[in-house]
Amino acid sequence: MEKLNLTQEWDKVFPKSDKVDHKKVTFHNRYGITLAADMYTPRGAEGKLPAIAVSGPFGAVKEQSSGLYAQKMAELGFLTIAFDPSYTGESGGTPRYVASPDINTEDFCAAVDFLSVQENVDPERIGIIGICGWGGMAINAAAIDTRIKATAAMTMYDMTRVTANGYFDAEDSEQARFEKKKAMNAQRTEDYRSGTYALAGGVVDPLPEDAPQFVKDYYAYYKTPRGYHSRSLNSNG
């Protein structure tokens, strides 16, 4: 399996809790990609604990909101992991910053694999949390994995739909979809010629005055000291 270069110092965008213990862990999915995660355990906990795997939002890293969710749930008595999806953050996989519903659904199932074999986890009490664009991935995983006993989708956004139809279905027409395919195909040609891959996504910068409120909310988190992280595509894309 791929050897990862993991940062050992605390580099989250939120303060470290004195109620939990934290460590870096790794696990692999069925595609052979090694994933990096932060594990949060209630301090002083004994016996087998309920566990939760957390990931998202789309384009974010575990040092941002997913880690905050994981740490908070650990304060409430759960053993938790917040993980970087395949191709993202400290996790493995190339080319970087690829999103795939199949692989990213598998990432959640792989997180359940990992949690299921931990000595201090009750394998009959494992849940998952998917945030924003990862809410859909969490629901996908829960639909196929009977080991997942509880699922929460927080502020879920359907990334497959927005990719196909645009925000607010603004590109939901035969002509718009054809033009999008033409642009993507032309970009493939250019990528092959240049030997690099063009990145899409991220948060618009500078922020237009007429941007929708949800885009302003994205900007206020990912592009400011409140939520900026150097490994996050949302912060740097």
Q: What kind of region is each of these model predictions?
A:
Residues 47-57:
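Short beta-strand element of the alpha/beta-hydrolase
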Residues 59-71, 85:
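The serine-hydrolase catalytic nucleophile loop
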Residues 119-132:
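Alpha/beta-hydrolase fold nucleophile elbow
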Residues 72-92:
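Conserved alpha/beta-hydrolase
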Residues 130-140:
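Glycine-rich nucleophile elbow surrounding the catalytic serine of serine-hydrolase chemistry
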Residues 2-47:
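N-terminal cap/lid segment of alpha/beta-hydrolase-fold proteins
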